[in-house]
Amino acid sequence: PDLPQQDLIATHPNWTRADFNRAVFLLSGRLKTANVQTAALWFDDAALFACAVLAVWHSGGRVLLLPNLARDNLDWGRTADVFLTDSEDLQSKLGSQTEQRDEFGQPLDVQSNPPVWHLPDLPAHTSPENSPPAPENHLIPNHAEAWLKTSGSSGEAQVIVKTAAQMQAEALMLAGALPFGRGGETVIGSVIPQHLYGFTFRFALALTMGWPMERRQAVY
């Protein structure tokens, strides 16, 4: 909140830091109200992913980052209190039959356990007029955790735990090694944001350096 509020967090479509922060705090408040301690994440949009991670962390929870939608990973995700996603694929994989709407007017999966919060239009509900005031404490706890699961493509899948402090330290180390400054470079990723490299480059490095994110994965 202390950084330039009209700078872009993401492109295509554009998302300013002011609107991004409002979305983080709005979702954080909703997670606190629902007493969510752990959220499983599956996103195509890197900016919505970043918003969800920060919201869970700000609310005092931890995130489980699914490497793909294979059955064993969905079972791992079911150990969380809620799924957060922008993907219709997740809902279909979980086998939901009935759709209701949450307070954002978005589809809410009421049959799966845990529930699925489908958040592709969250930014549309975070205008200054509709958003609650920013909380007094907007800091992310250093000990906030992200649990990443490797795909298992090179052996048995493993769970790696990263803290917010570790991710920031990694991002600062990378920033010192890369020949770029803070001149508005855009981060484009060829892996999903839930991937270990995606989490480092598309999330931590982009936010630490203030570089806008290209929302969609660049598949090649």
Name the predicted role of every residue range.
Residues 29-69, 185-193:
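Conserved AMP-binding/adenylate-forming
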Residues 52-60, 167, 202-207:
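Short hydrophobic alpha-helical segments of the AMP-binding
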Residues 2-33, 45-46, 162-165:
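Conserved AMP-binding/adenylate-forming core of the ANL superfamily
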